Structures are given as C-alpha cells and as structure tokens.
Swiss-Prot record:
Enzyme class, UniProt record, top EC level: hydrolase
Record's keyword terms, sorted: Carbohydrate metabolism, Glycogen metabolism, Glycosidase, Hydrolase
Cross-referenced HAMAP family: GlgX
Pathway: Glycan degradation; glycogen degradation
Protein name: Glycogen debranching enzyme
An annotated Gene Ontology molecular function: glycogen debranching enzyme activity
EC number: 3.2.1.196
Site note Transition state stabilizer, residues: D442
Presence of keyword Hydrolase: yes
Amino acid sequence: MMPIRDGQPAPRGASYDGKGVNFSLFSQRAERVELCLYDDDGVETRLDLPAHSGDIWHGYLPAVRPGQRYGYRVHGPWQPQQGLRFNPAKLLLDPCARGIEGEVTDNPCFQSGEEQPDTLDSGPLAPKGVVLADDFDWEDDTWPRVPWGSTVIYEAHVRGLTQLHPGIPAEMRGTYAALGHPVMIDYFQRLGITSLQLLPVACFASEPRLLRLGLSNYWGYNPLACYALESRYACGQNPREEFQQAVKTLHQAGIEVILDVVFNHSAELDENGPTLSMRGIDNPTYYWLDGQGNYDNWTGCGNTQNLVHPEAVASTLDCLRYWVEECHIDGFRFDLATTLGRTPEYRRDAPLFQAIAADPLLAQCKIIAEPWDIGPRGYQVGNFPPPFAEWNDHFRDTARRYWLHGDFSNGDFARRFAASSDLFQKQGRLPSASLNYITAHDGFTLRDLVSFEHKHNEANGEDNRDGSNNNFSYNHGVEGLKAPLLVTEHRRRSIHALLTTLLLAQGTPMLLAGDEHGHSQHGNNNAYCQDNVLTWLDWKHGDRGLFSFTAALIHLRRRIPALQQDRWWQEGDGSVEWLNGQGRQLNRLEWEQGVHRLQIRLSKQWLITLNATEEVCDLVLPPGKWHAVPPFAGEDNPILLTVWHGAAQGVCVFQEKS
C-alpha cells in the first residue's frame, strides 16, 4: 500500500474522488488516531492519520477503492469521571460512514471498562465502515414537492410493509426494492397518499438486553451510523443503490419519501453500554454528561446527544444534506425532537434549529418534529419554530376521547379539527404545522384501539410493564379481536368516525400503514422488538371494504378547498361553520357543554355530520339540497336528504348541489 498523505479535513467520513480515498474524523481531545483497514480475510492494517486541522484528523490513500472496510482506533486519556473514555483496544465506527458491514453482537469485547480500560480487542467483531462511490444515475429525477395543504402522510416500516405481500417476489419482500415494486406503487396511488414516511432506515443496533431474550430491535430507533443505510433491508449487495432506485421510482409516481431520523441518542446506551463509535472518539463532545461523567438520560435510551456543540450542528446538518443530495429524500421526521433544541434547557432558537431554518436545501424539505423527550420541560407541543410541523398528540387524544369515551366538549373537538390554532397559529405558522394522527407506530393500531381496553405486551419480555397505559381505547364491551356481530359493527362505526375525523380535519393527516385494512398487533402497543407476523402487515386477510372507505375519504379531502388551502379559517370567510343538530350555529352552551352532535360546514358546499353519542338521532341539515357522497353513498345513487338519521357513533358527509 502506498504511504498515506495528509489529505483534507472536508468532507467528513471516507470520500472517494476516483483516484483514492480521503479519510476525515473529528476528535477534539484525541492524542492519536489510527485508521484501520480490513481486507477480505479480516486482516487489519493500521495507519496513523498524519494530519489534523483544528480538531479534524485526516489522511488520503491513493490506493484505496470503493468497497474498502475500515474503522478507527483513537488514543487519549482514560478518565471516566471527566467523561474521557479513549480506548484503542476498541475499533470505532466512523460516525459519517456511508456504508456499514457487520452487526453489533452481545459480546464482552464491546465493553469499554470501568476503573481501567478494557483490553479485549473488538476489531474482529466490530461493524466496519465501507467506502462507497457516489455514482447512482438519477437521470431526470425531481422532487415531487407536494404542497403541505395537499399532503397525506403514510407511516410505514420497510420490512413490515411488504414482508407478507403475496404480489411481490419472495426474495424482494421486506426490502427497499419492494417499496418501488409496481404492486406497491399501484397500491399507494389507489389509496391516495402523497408521502411515504419510513421508520428509521439508517444503520441501527439491537440492544444487548433484547439479544439475550432472543429478540431484536425492529423499529430501528437505536442508531449506529446516521449516514449509512441499514443493510438488513436490502435484497441485493448494494443497500444504498437499491434504496436510491426505490426513491426514484416513487418520485416517478409523484410520491414523496420522508425519513424518520434519530439524532437524540445512540446505540452506545449508558455507562455500561457497548463502545462502538462516538464514546471512544470524543465522548464529552458528543454526549450530555453530568459532573461525574455519567450520561444525562433525557431520551430514555441511556444517553443524550449534545447538539449544541458546533461540530454536532455541522455534522447533523451535513448528514441531512447528504440524504437529500445523494438519496433525494423529501423530508425528515425527527425522533424526540426536543433534544435537538436542548442547550441543555429547551430553546426555540437553539443552534441546530437556526441552522436547519437557514439552509437553502433543507428549506425545500418537509421538516417534522416529535415534540417531546423525557427530560426537564421535555413536552414542547406547539413550541417549535418554523419550518417544523409537529406531531399533535392533542388531536390524537381529543379524537379518541370524543368518539370512544364521550369526553371533551364540541368546542374542544372543533379546536383540534381546525388544526389546533391555539397551539400553532403563531410566528407565521400555517395549519399544516399541526400533524394530525390517531395512531402511529408507537401505540395501538386503529383496529386494536377499538378492540382492546388494555395493552397486551407480554411478548416483549418485560412482564407487560412497557408501553403506555393511557391509550384512551375502548373495546366496546369485549376484550380482543373476536366479538359478536353487534360489537363488530360498533367497532366498525368507531373506526369510520376516527378515520373521517383524521382525513377531513384541517392540518396534515398521517395514516399508520395497515390501519386502512384493519391490521392488528393483538393488543401489543409497544411492538418495537417484534420482527415477526405480529407487526408485518397481513395482506391476504385485509379488510377491502375498509381500504375502499379510507381511499374514498382521502380522495374526498382533495375536493374540499378549505382543506387544501393551508390557511387559517377565519369567521365569516366561508371556510367553516359550526352547526348544531338543528342546522343552526352552535350557541355558547352547545359549544362548551352540548351533547356530542355536530355539523361542520366546509367551503359552504360540504357538510360533515357527527353523532358521537350512543343513541340514534336525527340531525336537521341546514337549508339546501344535500347529497350524501362516497364513501357514505354511491356515485350513481346519491342520497338527497334534509334530515340525517344518524346511527350511534355515526358520521356522514354531504355535498350541496344546485
């Protein structure tokens, strides 16, 4: 091998220029950095990075080509109480590696040490970075740029979405390639969604505790390397190229791809967790530590990344730009996003927020926050700055309690239906900032929400202690999926009411994959470690009628101007009227204490009627010629009504025609 040259400090990671590879690694406190190259037989060659510019260590190797496996051994003091955990016995993964080979196992060689550094060499078993070439042919691919007002998000897991799909070749099921298969493209288009939001696809690890139980991390919220695609979702040898092709195909169909990204913590867990990467590279820079060198655990995952440091801001921004530039991603959903704004207290003007807002490339992307973590003042719904949209759990809980428990007033329901203006109508934010959902990957599926009163998480190995107990679910009198026909009919009505609320409310709707055809996880509301038929969508036995109902609602949403314009509804502008059961405007008493019967008139010619009571009732429609529309009546046989005979827990939509 040729002698290593000084190289350049940028870009971060391993960059192939057609002649060789530049290696660049940040470490403010390191005393020496060894680049470790591995051949096909696992033989290691060590080379000191010869130069460092400020806190960036770097070197260039002319002889190296794409496919090269590599890692780092970083030398420095071992002073855990000061947060310094350098240990050259541990091979460290490049945080900016574009490709990864190998998986983390439950092996003692990954332990760093306590009073003294552990001397077991992790090199033979540690995951390695892989050098990649940026040579994918995007041809004339363009980002769909779906307006926020027209956006309908579909949250899905790469494996779970297609693992059991009979229309996809067996070798392709559960992979990136399956996302772009014609069967799935056709399905997305018939359903009507505009944006596919994927649970984490960046490389992640399974926690040692799960491995000991014979389980694995299924969701992927345990990140190992945020630039690299998870190889277990690839059916071929090149995960990134396979993913790029899927994105390209989805774009050709006009469908956006949004990634769930995890920058709040890492797979290194707490002080007793494995040393895999950042802990051994520059622990005090990458993580929030207390005065004794222990990790601040504001994420519930053992550690919390420090995203105030200029290097952390720069590398996070670079990672986001990488996904947009190299993989043509359309947007990001940030897991536990309060952590991104910690300084360590939460600030709307935190450095990373300002950097995202100022970046011209990211300004064209959809930016979504999960607006909480478990740290001090971690709940920040409505308090994120533009351009963030936010998961609105107020919408979720109000919709569930209004329909399933008879809680909240008509006014409370209307406030959430109108994009939660009390939370989001500030600092120039638009209604689309309220990302509305009834269910998500975390919690009950929609079918389980109306079938189980209690969680059933025994399979997770924690004696049913994990998962939320505050689900606001209702089993309609029978626990579990099997129930008498009358109970099944009541559940169907509740599902229809909740879907109608979600898909015809102002704001940005997000639908959980599988809810549109009745997927169940049999009462498990925390299936993060269930990579099996419990979480994989059952396509053979899906409820086709429910799919048709959901698709019709999405297509109906497109026809209602008040839901497409992404501007706040104002009194008297014709966007909305709130009416009682007699077709008259709600008075104050009905607004605050009235029975749960409501009519919502949108854009003057559309009328949504709701009966969220347990009794059949008649609602007098406002003056006009009102025709029930699909999915509440057939296209060829619209029903003309002046009074709606509303079933208990019933809903209907009408259009006024001259």
